[in-house]
């Protein structure tokens, strides 16, 4: 007979009874550190510091197993409280009394209260605002298996299709959905001649028999009038064959529904014609902006995403038998002081697309339009007015409501939430990066960060957006729920506190079926393998040669490579703390063997002008210090940010020509677009294990994982690769080919676009026919936004032109 599972408290108590002395000594050691918050590596270090005999006795105990799952410890004598992550998304909280060796289970508010006591005990006597979104999602089905995280639409379709389609009466929401379907006043799918499910089945069979006698390529216009008389309108397909496929799918659903058929059917229904994409911050333009402050991977992502989406929308609309022109608007900020960019133009056509445009709307206050760039951390006072202005501008451009609104990053997702709520439109959220995970303890010590980063506004906006949206897409599983040992970006918002501000008891559930993993790719017109000689941009080679090897030092490049025949270790990113470009320079500088084997080329920061970004200024100062301290000139080249994407693509390929490698050393990377770009060009890649690259790369097969917190080991791994390539040249080719194979299987914009548009349709359908519109939570969020977010945003100083 199976034994019942022991609770967390019982597991601790069983260890206390068998190892009382050893546990007392260990916990006393932790307590002696004084009151405070300890991270997992500190707990591990303290355990390693106890006597070897005690360590051996405890190694297999439940205490150590649970300590290995602890993400944090709060020492508040005589108690030690632990936040234990049993698996991704599943947490429990306990506290241990060091003197009495007793254990108590804690609720989330109890645990957060103890944490607040350490930081701001004086505020705990007052009423504390608690945020708890759990009651609003209680009726929404959720999976329980870790493998289901990020596969929300599959779970939702399985669960709700089984529930909805139990009998013919429960089919009415689907019938109503098809009958109410329209675009710009034009009825699609079914007209009012179809009143019942039985009636729908009858005409599907009649029409199916008629279609079976026609040539498969017969255009819909040939039988449009006949079908209209029995209840069908346009939208089923452009030819007899496509219409017949749709009819058969719907008949199958009405007879014996299954999740796969339902998703395929919904993906083919014409639902998305107009899309609005929000990305307010930075310098959003198509040329000469990459490397500007707050302007990097997100801009590239959207400019690659939009042409691919437009192509997929155009293809679907044609196959649906419609003559509607799809429109995509990328809404960003208009910058009157455009600094040599097109950011002062209201409307700009997107390269590679026919009907997609960048629509720019300025930030304004009562005093007028803000002219200059401001940091993404300072945008909060402008967002609500910006939203109102955006609503007017998109109405002017589209002459209709959008069918899907996609937000990007914190402020883009907040604006998307406000717009979607105002217009009643399906909303998609893409975080790219949630700052709370990039800056450790930025929640508990928010007041220390707030003057510089205004995280109180940003974290509040993030909570509003992730709970308001209909669906969230992420590039990786790690973005949602981390890994066995690390907490995911969204998962870190499950429970946290900002003392004196509010306490989040239940912020988000990573098992929520709104989460879906949809990985992007690289623009294959720009990024393609170095081996495709006929496509190579040889006309650019002289200037790339000059960029890498010229003996001239100026504001575009400093330091000279003396041995131009060595392989190049290459990295390219924004110059900020998290991207850690100075980290890779330091690893290289301190490893004589690596310096002997390869040259290091870093592209990042803009030395051609004075940076207004404080982080970039600090990183530049550090870079100059490393160059001087380690005498890197001769083996190292520092190039200012390169804004020409086409040339950057050829630059990757030229690095591959040297049999070099790409390294991405970030402390955390939500996805890793440069990793995709480098691998698409055939460049062997070393990338951080913290975040998305851990999923993109299969270690040792399509690249290598490195830990930026252990730079010496990372440098040794790179040394080992290049040493092996010297003795076994085919090893370089093997890793290069492995990277290309990985990209082609999983990371292309075509796969991405197909998935995103299907998700938009499926969630739009479920929102219409079930309670997934989450009305209750949206009313709660309106109040939270008005009473808390607005005050926080108003406390952020307005910029001065």
UniProtKB/Swiss-Prot annotation:
Transmembrane segments: none annotated. GO terms for biological process: sucrose metabolic process. Belongs to the glycosyltransferase 1 family. Plant sucrose synthase subfamily. Keywords: Glycosyltransferase, Transferase. Its EC number is 2.4.1.13. NCBIfam families: sucr_synth (TIGR02470). Homotetramer. InterPro entries: Glyco_trans_1, Sucrose_synth_GT-B1, Sucrose_synthase_pln/cyn, SUS_EPBD, SUS_N. PANTHER family: PTHR45839, SUCROSE SYNTHASE 1. Disulfide bonds: none annotated. One of its GO terms (molecular function) is sucrose synthase activity. Exclusively expressed in flowers. Residues 271-748 are annotated as: GT-B glycosyltransferase. It catalyses: an NDP-alpha-D-glucose + D-fructose = a ribonucleoside 5'-diphosphate + sucrose + H(+). This is Sucrose synthase isoform 2. Sucrose-cleaving enzyme that provides UDP-glucose and fructose for various metabolic pathways. It comes from the Eukaryota.
């Amino acid at each position: 007979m199976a034994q019942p599972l022991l609770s967390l408290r019982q597991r601790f108590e069983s260890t206390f009874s068998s190892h009382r002395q050893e546990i007392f000594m260990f916990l006393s050691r932790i307590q002696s550190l004084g009151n405070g918050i300890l991270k997992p590596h500190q707990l591990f270090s303290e355990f390693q510091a106890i006597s070897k005999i005690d360590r051996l006795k405890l190694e297999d105990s439940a205490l150590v197993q649970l300590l290995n799952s602890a993400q944090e410890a709060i020492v508040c004598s005589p108690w030690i409280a632990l936040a234990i992550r049993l698996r991704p998304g599943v947490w429990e909280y306990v506290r241990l009394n060091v003197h009495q060796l007793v254990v108590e289970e804690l609720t989330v508010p109890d645990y957060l209260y103890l944490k607040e006591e350490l930081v701001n005990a004086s505020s705990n006597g007052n009423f504390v605002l608690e945020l708890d979104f759990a009651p609003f999602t209680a009726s929404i089905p959720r999976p329980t298996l870790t493998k289901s995280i990020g596969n929300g639409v599959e779970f939702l379709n399985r669960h709700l299709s089984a529930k909805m389609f139990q009998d013919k009466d429960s089919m009415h929401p689907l019938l109503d959905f098809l009958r109410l379907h329209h675009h710009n006043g034009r009825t699609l799918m079914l007209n009012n001649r179809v009143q019942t499910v039985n009636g729908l089945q009858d005409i599907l069979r009649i029409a199916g028999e008629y279609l079976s006698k026609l040539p498969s390529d017969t255009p819909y216009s040939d039988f449009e009038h006949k079908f209209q008389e029995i209840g069908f309108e346009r939208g089923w397909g452009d030819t007899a064959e496509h219409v017949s496929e749709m009819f058969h799918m719907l008949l199958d659903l009405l007879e014996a529904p299954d999740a796969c058929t339902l998703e395929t059917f919904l993906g083919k229904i014409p639902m998305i014609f107009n899309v609005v994409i929000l990305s307010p911050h930075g310098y959003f333009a198509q040329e000469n902006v990459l490397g500007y402050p707050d302007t990097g991977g997100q801009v590239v992502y959207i400019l690659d995403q939009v042409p691919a989406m437009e192509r997929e929308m155009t293809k679907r609309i044609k196959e649906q038998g419609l003559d509607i022109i799809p429109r995509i608007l990328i809404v960003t900020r208009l910058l009157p002081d455009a600094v040599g960019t097109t950011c002062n133009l209201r409307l700009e056509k997107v390269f590679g697309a026919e009907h997609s445009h960048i629509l720019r709307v300025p930030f304004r206050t009562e005093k007028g339009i803000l002219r200059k760039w401001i940091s993404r951390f300072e945008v909060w006072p402008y967002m609500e007015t910006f939203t109102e202005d955006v609503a007017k501008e998109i109405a002017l451009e589209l002459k209709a409501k959008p069918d899907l609104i996609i937000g990007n990053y914190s402020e883009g997702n907040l604006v998307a939430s406000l717009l979607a709520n105002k217009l009643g439109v399906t909303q998609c959220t893409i975080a790219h990066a949630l700052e709370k995970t990039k800056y450790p303890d930025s929640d508990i010590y928010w007041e220390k960060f707030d003057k510089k980063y205004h995280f109180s506004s940003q974290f509040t906006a993030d909570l509003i957006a992730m709970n308001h949206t209909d669906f969230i897409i992420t590039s990786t599983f790690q973005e949602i729920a981390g890994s066995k040992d690390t907490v995911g970006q969204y998962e870190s918002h499950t429970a946290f506190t900002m003392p004196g501000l509010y306490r989040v008891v239940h912020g988000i559930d990573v098992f929520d079926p709104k989460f879906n993993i949809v990985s992007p790719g690289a623009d294959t017109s720009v990024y393609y393998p170095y081996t495709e000689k006929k496509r190579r941009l040889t006309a650019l080679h002289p200037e790339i040669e000059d960029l890498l090897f010229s003996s001239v030092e100026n504001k575009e490049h400093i330091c000279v490579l003396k041995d131009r025949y060595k392989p190049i270790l290459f990295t390219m990113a924004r110059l900020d703390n998290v991207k850690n470009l100075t980290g890779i320079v330091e690893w290289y500088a301190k490893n004589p063997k690596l310096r002997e084997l390869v040259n290091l080329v870093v592209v990042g920061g803009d030395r051609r002008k004075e940076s207004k970004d404080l982080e970039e200024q600090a990183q530049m100062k550090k870079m100059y210090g490393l160059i001087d301290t380690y005498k890197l000139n001769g083996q190292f080249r520092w190039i200012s940010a390169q804004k020409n994407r086409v040339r950057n693509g050829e630059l990757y390929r030229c690095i591959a020509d040297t049999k070099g490698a790409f390294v991405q050393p970030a402390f955390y990377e939500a996805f890793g677009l440069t990793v995709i770009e480098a691998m698409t060009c055939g460049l062997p890649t070393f990338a951080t294990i913290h975040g998305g690259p851990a999923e993109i790369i299969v270690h040792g097969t399509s690249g290598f994982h490195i830990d930026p917190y252990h730079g010496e080991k990372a440098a040794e791994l790179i040394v080992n690769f290049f040493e092996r390539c010297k003795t076994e040249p085919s090893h370089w080719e093997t890793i290069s080919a492995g990277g290309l194979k990985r990209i082609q299987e999983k990371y292309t914009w075509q796969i991405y676009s197909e998935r995103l548009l299907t998700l938009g349709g499926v969630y739009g359908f479920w929102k219409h026919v079930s309670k997934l519109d989450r009305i209750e939570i949206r009313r709660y969020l309106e109040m939270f936004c008005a009473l808390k977010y607005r005050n926080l945003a108003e406390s952020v100083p307005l910029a001065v032109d």
